[in-house]
């Protein structure tokens, strides 16, 4: 007869997502309605992403914030500019503190990114454009690049 351990959540290392939320959202559509008529070609998209990590007052609780900005332009107009600060509160349970930086910089952003991506797609579509579907982001590669730049 086998025994099943039902106590796994209390002892196993895991990440708990306690909250997800929009901290700030801004969309500018400065050339409308003229820019909406000029959508015969695919716009140039300039995208920037930053991650902010804040240690909260309660032990092993962190806020991970994605800052995403996208600017779309064509030959004539700045079509739109969208800025989103989207965050999550994470509890790192039974995880060695040496692993916290990589988890907070890679795994936690990857968990909330699909929600931020959806918000940006919905907002740009509601502004009269094709939804901006941001490609998946390799947060691991970004983390390793940042670490190698920091060492140099």
UniProtKB/Swiss-Prot annotation:
Which keywords are on file for this protein? Chaperone, Cytoplasm, Protein transport, Translocation, Transport
One annotated GO biological process: protein transport
Gene Ontology CC: cytoplasm
Q: Where is this protein chiefly located?
A: cytoplasm
- Gene Ontology molecular-function annotations: unfolded protein binding
Query: Where does this polypeptide localize?
Result: Cytoplasm
Q: Which residues form the signal peptide?
A: none
Q: Relate the assembly described in the record.
A: Homotetramer, a dimer of dimers. One homotetramer interacts with 1 SecA dimer.
Looking up HAMAP family in the UniProt record yields: SecB
Give the similarity note: Belongs to the SecB family.
Q: What does this protein do?
A: One of the proteins required for the normal export of preproteins out of the cell cytoplasm. It is a molecular chaperone that binds to a subset of precursor proteins, maintaining them in a translocation-competent state. It also specifically binds to its receptor SecA.
Q: What is this protein called?
A: Protein-export protein SecB
């Amino acid at each position: 007869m086998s025994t099943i351990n039902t106590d796994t959540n209390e002892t196993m290392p895991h990440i708990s997502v306690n909250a997800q939320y929009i901290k700030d959202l801004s969309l500018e559509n400065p050339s409308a309605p003229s820019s909406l008529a000029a959508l015969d070609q695919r716009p140039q998209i300039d995208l920037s992403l930053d991650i902010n990590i804040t240690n909260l007052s309660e032990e092993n609780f962190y806020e991970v914030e994605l800052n995403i900005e996208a600017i779309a332009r064509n030959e004539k107009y700045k079509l739109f500019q969208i800025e989103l600060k989207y965050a999550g509160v994470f509890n790192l349970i039974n995880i060695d503190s040496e692993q916290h930086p990589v988890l907070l910089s890679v795994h936690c952003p990857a968990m909330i990114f699909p929600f931020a991506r959806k918000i940006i797609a919905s907002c740009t579509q509601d502004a009269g454009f094709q939804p901006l579907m941001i490609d998946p982001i390799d947060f691991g590669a970004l983390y390793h690049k940042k670490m190698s730049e920091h060492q140099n």
